[in-house]
Amino acid sequence: MSAVDPIADMFSAIKNAIMRRDAFLYVPSSKMKERILEVLKREGFIQDWEALKGEKYEEEFKKMKELAEKSPNPKMRRYLQQLIDYNKGTQYPLKIYLKYLDPKKRRSALTNIVRVSKGGRRVYAGVRTMPYVKRGLGIAIVSTDAGVMTDHEARKLRKGGEVIAFVW
């Protein structure tokens, strides 16, 4: 993954994991990613997420190493490699548990996630110009001076800010 737009990389990793019908995935950490994941969890698009620091990382690494050695499934080796790659310097892996509405068909709660504000073109919206996503059925994730929140919460607090993504 490139370091040009880490948030877009996280969104791509989530979409790819949903297409593979994975139960969870790992992404490198950042404060902004943690805030975005908290909004996605609160709105019901993902089941949960956790930061794997210190002992949690060691436990997860042991578990994945054992599974990768026992299983011929290449998916386990990929997870193990991600754990190793994302635990460098001050970064640590974030484990995202995906949410599926129908366990048999594995239909995801998250249909699509689109990055709006990018490095080359920042998109800002005031209270009156805050976009509605899918006529109110989706959410816009907005970064305001009061923190990262949905478009509904931003309208309620009368705050504008940078539109990070559309989710439905």
UniProtKB/Swiss-Prot annotation:
Record InterPro entries: Ribosomal_uS8 (IPR000630), Ribosomal_uS8_CS (IPR047863), Ribosomal_uS8_sf (IPR035987)
Pfam families in UniProt: Ribosomal_S8 (PF00410)
Assigned GO CC terms: ribonucleoprotein complex; ribosome
One record GO biological process: translation
Region (Not found in other S8 sequences): 59-93
PROSITE patterns tied to this protein: RIBOSOMAL_S8
One Gene Ontology molecular-function label: rRNA binding
HAMAP family registered for this protein in UniProt: Ribosomal_uS8_B
Recorded family membership: Belongs to the universal ribosomal protein uS8 family.
Function of the protein: One of the primary rRNA binding proteins, it binds directly to 16S rRNA central domain where it helps coordinate assembly of the platform of the 30S subunit.
Name by which UniProt lists this protein: Small ribosomal subunit protein uS8
Organism in which the protein naturally occurs: Aquifex pyrophilus
